[in-house]
Every structure is written in C-alpha cells, then in structure tokens.
C-alpha cells in the first residue's frame, strides 16, 4: 500500500537526482475539470492556458532539472477554499522539505506570483540563490537615503544593475524588452550573475511547462472519474509517479 502523501514520489526519484547540482523550479498549473461540480479539490482558478477563470484543480509542483532531465520531487494541491494552505505557504513548505531531504540546488527558479518578501527571505535563510521575475511596481532604491521608486522607472543596462529591493536588500535586476514593447524584470540575489547566465537559467525554468504538458497529455492527470478528495489525491500521485 502506497502512502497518500508525496513520500512515495520522493522514494522513487531520490536515486535519480543529483542533490547538490541542477536547479529547482516551482510553478503551478490548473487541471481542467469543466464538467465537474465545484466540490472537494475542484474549485475555480485562473487558467493561464484559457486566460480566464475555470473549474479545476490547482496543482503546485517542485521540479528538479539539470537541463537534460525533468524529475518532479514534490507537489501540493491548492485547496484554500476548503481551509487549506495558501500557494505561498506551499512554496515555503516544499523548499523546507527539499532542504531536509538534502537538496542544495544551484538556483531556485519561480514566477513573480511567488516573489513575495516572505518567500525571498525564506530562500535567504536557506542560503539558496534564486532567479525570479518581479512586477513592474515593486519598489527599489539606488542609493542609501534615496526615495523608493518602481522598478519600471529605473534605468537598467543589458548587463543588469544592483538595486535595493524595499524590505529585502540588494538584488541584481535585468530588464528584457519584447518586440511588442512589453517588459519583464528578472531579479536574482546572485550579484555575479551575467545576462548569459540569466538567459540560460530562464530556459531551464521553462522545463516545468514541458513537464506539466506531458503530465496532462501522456499521464492522464486530468482524466480521473472520481469525486472524493482521497481518491483524487491518490490519482494525482499515481499520475505524477507515472511521469
């Protein structure tokens, strides 16, 4: 009989992971349940795929990758409407569990949704380098005693620039401008990171998108014909292990 938590997943992948190499990537995805009644783990979530609110299950994944291999090492289900933890709490819990399991990644990669001060400080306590994106309205200062301004207002060269993120400390920020004029701000606590390194890490961060796509298309994670929460959790675990 397999345990109903994520221990079974870890037992399966721990021998395949280089614990002091590679990167950890955290992101979430919505498992579509368009015909299910909102109950148990099925609630309303924003879907990046559909660009609207849909019925489904919100799955958070902690993925280990070295650029050539993708291995899920932990996951959580966001069920806050039923009294569960927030996404940010799940973020910190999975990182704490990863440390207890002996993981020491070269970097932790995640989206701006998880770039709260509490999460960034949790990573600082772990002494793990990170790379994330920040929203354009996050406040920074360039010199001591200077008034804080939105990061979007700061002049940032291609090689990046050190700024003081309000409430956290010094970080290095890179700005990318898309052909349509949209901008993205990438931030790391590694002051020595180059733009080439940032770009390479950003590509590794996209591995979790490939993982989520494979989980849905090849492992049937969205296809469980069950209603109870324990049965759904069991199906999620088996689908992830099948990957």
Where would I find each of the regions flagged by the language model?
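Active-site-proximal, Lys/Arg-enriched surface segment
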Residues: 2-69, 73, 79
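Alpha/propeptide regions of enzymes that mature by internal proteolysis
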Residues: 1-2, 105
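Single, function-defining residue in the core of a domain
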Residues: 9, 20, 33-37, 68-243
